[in-house]
Amino acid sequence: MQKTERSMDKNLLERYLSETENVVDTARLRLRRQATVVHLMKLEGKDVAPAVELMTQFERVLTIWEGIRDFLLRQLGRELPPAAGDD
């Protein structure tokens, strides 16, 4: 019975991990797009403060999701990905 429960738990963790990785990937893409928008706004001489504030809030949310992803990876005994910017 315990082996079946562990197997089900692992399957559930795998599913959560997959969904979380999709959220993280999408969030990173949106941040890159927003950075492009901010750059274009600067070139046009527009006020970028609201857009930068939005990016800051989005980065905080992304950090939370990355933490969830890392927790799930550790629970599954997997290697953590390199930190952002460590390419």
Where are these regions (language model features)?
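Anionic, Ser/Thr-rich low-complexity intrinsically disordered regions
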Residues: 1-87
